[in-house]
Swiss-Prot record:
Location of this chain's protein in the cell: Plastid, Chloroplast thylakoid membrane
Gene: psaA
Oligomeric form and interacting partners: The PsaA/B heterodimer binds the P700 chlorophyll special pair and subsequent electron acceptors. PSI consists of a core antenna complex that captures photons, and an electron transfer chain that converts photonic excitation into a charge separation. The eukaryotic PSI reaction center is composed of at least 11 subunits.
Topology term for the membrane: Multi-pass membrane protein
Role, per record: PsaA and PsaB bind P700, the primary electron donor of photosystem I (PSI), as well as the electron acceptors A0, A1 and FX. PSI is a plastocyanin-ferredoxin oxidoreductase, converting photonic excitation into a charge separation, which transfers an electron from the donor P700 chlorophyll pair to the spectroscopically characterized acceptors A0, A1, FX, FA and FB in turn. Oxidized P700 is reduced on the lumenal side of the thylakoid membrane by plastocyanin.
Name of the protein this chain belongs to: Photosystem I P700 chlorophyll a apoprotein A1
InterPro entries found in the cross-reference section: PSI_PsaA, PSI_PsaA/B, PSI_PsaA/B_CS, PSI_PsaA/B_sf
Binding site for [4Fe-4S] cluster: 573, 582
Length: 750
């Protein structure tokens, strides 16, 4: 007789038809809440409807039902993303000059929007070169499409239709996995299987398929494009895939097929999987062969990572075991209990993911210019500036979101009874030490960083340049940063065989890459001016962290309000008779953190914009002389507050202020309008609820007098609502103002 080990039983992890599909609930606003479903008595109703519609915690306390709603909403989100992508590709196919740009990317600007001639708006269609008139776009899609090997507008059409199909599919999936086959809670909590699928599937096979596409489609097509072949003459993608001889003409080792792979003679593939470093002098982008190699390597790493965790076959790591074994000499119970937190609190999970994704997004911002991944991206200054600014803002918002959801976790999901002496408990017990030290650091950084500028302004005003902190007087060189730059500049040849240049030209080493007479990238010098502004960065980041961390650590209780957890995530004050307890909720800390995040990111993007125009971007003559856009004025001008105001904000705002009557005039209007939106926010931030309630009551009196009073009673915004509206307009106004200022400037001079 044969003895078999018992087969692991496959558990059924979905419920069939849990919730019937009905459109009737759509007709009942607020169907998720008993109070809101009754309909409006006062105008507060519409605000509560918006505040709670997506707050699934407030609809039910059943974790399984909440999980299903979140899961289903994710498919809705993906559907919108595919729809948006489809729109981008459709614009490229239908309204753009992509094919013209492809034939001459150095002299023709990218445009994918042509304004219709209504009331004279066609003035916005500027001349982007090659006889095409339209709005210059700065999203980087053209460069991305070229890198992917897209050579015609027909291919863009096909991709747009494909994305539309996927959008519909995602919409269907969201409905199906909520109404027809909804996963059970156990499925959402099976972290090892999730890691298996996300690491090996999404990241591993995703990177592998992209690497395959790059090798078989992107590389040969870009090889032809770089050689100046007409895009219409280049074979179509499927021809490269089906006909190996075509590829073998470009990369002879293709003729040998997979033999070198299985005989471990991998160096045969070094024609198209390279490790060169630096930039391709033809396109000013990273070597596409380096990028293909990178994605292949990433794929291998993640395919291995995806097979490290214990699923149906009892081998591999268990996340719970790893976390509980993670103890240090000073950390008590260590991560014991963290597994339970992360599998039962989606806020805790989301908080970690937002913190990491936000940091990663900021890392992306810094790599997009220092290692420009796509052909002709580095010389498209408007796109470079836009991509940096965009990723910085997004990263800032995600990090504030991380603090918001950490605080919601503390208020709603944290259970102090079964948390004793683990790391989180230990952090909470010495939160006073953490916050007071952080506060001291903020005071130190604020006074010293700002003090250096004030010193320089004073000396400059008194006509004593020799007593200023500058590269030509009292030097404060960023020696550590310069040391890191130098180390990287010396690295090629020592770190990897065959590497000819360092990871980024910005490190140093003297070489410069220019494309079509424009600088793509060159070594970026750091001096006293950078030292000063970097300490402003340190200051603003630390203050943001102070506010957000205080909100999280004191979300449940504080000396002022020991029972804060009972008041919830957002509340205006601790009730009547408790003066001085307003604006202390966890929500209020997020509110305040947003302003400091805005400060921090603004300084970063201003620094970047000016530094690049002053020391990197510009034109190069036949003799090799580089002329920068602002002629290297950053080092001497940005060392005083006055310099920032005069030589950056004011001097560079001339393009947006003088844009009326030109194709950039829309930016002038946005600049004006966004200032108004920003100023509008102050009305909400600087006045109290009672003021508005009094005003409303006299307006209601007038309506009653004329017998036109509505059935729904008007009410002033609550304190929290008013602050929410205020911060929203503050950020929207500020960001849109910056956007108009940056783009009008860089499109005009770049």
């Amino acid at each position: 007789m044969i003895i078999r080990s018992p087969e692991p039983e496959v558990k059924i992890l979905v419920d069939r038809d849990p919730i019937k599909t009905s459109f009737e609930e759509w007709a009942k606003p607020g169907h998720f809440s008993r109070t809101i479903a009754k309909g409006p008595d006062t105008t507060t109703w519409i605000w509560n409807l918006h505040a709670d519609a997506h707050d699934f915690d407030s609809h039910t306390s059943d974790l399984e039902e909440i999980s299903r709603k979140v899961f289903s909403a994710h498919f809705g989100q993906l559907s919108i993303i595919f729809l948006w992508l489809s729109g981008m590709y459709f614009h490229g196919a239908r309204f753009s000059n992509y094919e013209a740009w492809l034939s001459d990317p150095t002299h023709i600007g990218p445009s994918a929007q042509v304004v219709w001639p209504i009331v004279g708006q066609e003035i916005l269609n500027g001349d982007v070169g090659g006889g095409f008139r339209g709005i210059q776009i700065t999203s980087g899609f053209f460069q991305l499409w070229r890198a992917s090997g897209i050579t015609s507008e027909l291919q863009l059409y096909c991709t747009a239709i494909g994305a539309l199909v996927f959008s519909a599919l995602m919409l269907f999936a969201g409905w199906f996995h909520y109404h027809k086959a909804a996963p059970k809670l156990a499925w959402f909590q099976d972290v090892e299987s999730m890691l298996n699928h996300h690491l090996a599937g999404l990241l591993g096979l995703g990177s592998l398929s992209w690497a395959g596409h790059q090798v078989h489609v992107s590389l040969p097509i870009n090889q032809f494009l770089n050689a100046g072949v007409d895009p219409k003459e280049i074979p179509l993608p499927h021809e490269f895939i089906l006909n190996r001889d075509l590829l073998a003409q470009l990369y002879p080792s293709f003729a040998e097929g997979a033999t070198p792979f299985f005989t471990l003679n991998w160096s045969k593939y070094s024609e198209f999987l390279t490790f060169r470093g630096g930039l391709d002098p033809v396109t000013g982008g990273l070597w596409l062969t380096d990028i293909a190699h990178h994605h292949l390597a990433i794929a291998i790493l993640f395919l291995i990572a995806g097979h490290m965790y214990r699923t149906n076959w009892g081998i591999g790591h268990g996340i719970k075991d790893i976390l509980e074994a993670h103890k240090g000499p000073f950390t008590g119970q260590g991560h014991k209990g963290l597994y339970e937190i992360l599998t039962t609190s989606w806020h805790a999970q989301l908080s970690l993911n937002l913190a990491m994704l936000g940091s990663l997004t900021i890392v992306v911002a810094h790599h997009m210019y220092s290692m420009p991944p796509y052909p002709y991206l580095a010389t498209d200054y408007a796109t470079q500036l836009s991509l940096f600014t965009h990723h910085m803002w997004i990263g800032g918002f995600l990090i504030v979101g991380a603090a918001a959801h950490a605080a919601i976790f503390m208020v709603r999901d944290y259970d102090p009874t079964n948390r004793y002496n683990d790391l989180l408990d230990r952090v909470l017990r010495h939160r006073d030490a953490i916050i007071s030290h952080l506060n001291w650091v903020c005071i130190f950084l604020g006074f010293h960083s700002f003090g250096l500028y004030i010193h320089n302004d004073t000396m400059s005003a008194l006509g004593r340049p020799q007593d200023m902190f500058s590269d030509t007087a009292i030097q404060l060189q960023p020696v550590f940063a310069q040391w890191i730059q130098n180390t990287h500049a010396l690295a090629p040849g020592v770190t990897a065989p065959g590497e000819t240049a360092s990871t980024s030209l910005t490190w140093g080493g003297g070489e410069l890459v220019a494309v079509g007479g424009k600088v793509a990238l060159l070594p970026i010098p750091l001096g006293t001016a950078d030292f000063l502004v970097h300490h402003i960065h340190a200051f603003t980041i630390h203050v943001t962290v102070l506010i957000l961390l205080k909100g999280v650590l004191f979300a449940r209780s504080s000396r002022l309000i020991p029972d804060k957890a009972n008041l919830g995530f957002r509340f205006p004050c601790d009730g009547p008779g408790r003066g001085g307890t307003c604006q202390v909720s966890a929500w209020d800390h997020v509110f305040l953190g947003l302003f400091w995040m805005y400060n921090a990111i603004s300084v970063v993007i201003f620094h970047f914009s000016w530094k690049m125009q002053s020391d990197v971007w510009g034109s190069i003559s036949d003799q090799g002389v580089v002329t920068h856009i602002t002629g290297g004025n950053f080092a001497q001008s940005s060392i005083t507050i006055n310099g920032w105001l005069r030589d950056f904000l004011w001097a560079q705002a001339s393009q947006v202020i003088q844009s009326y009557g030109s194709s950039l005039s829309a930016y002038g209007l946005f600049f004006l309008g966004a200032h108004f939106v920003w100023a509008f926010s102050l009305m909400f931030l600087f006045s109290g609820r009672g003021y508005w309630q009094e005003l409303i009551e006299s307006i209601v009196w007038a309506h009653n007098k004329l017998k036109v009073a509505p059935a729904t009673q008007p009410r002033a915004l609550s304190i929290v609502q008013g602050r929410a509206v205020g911060v929203t307009h503050y950020l929207l106004g500020g960001i849109a103002t910056t956007w108009a200022f940056f783009l009008a400037r860089i499109i005009a001079v770049g």
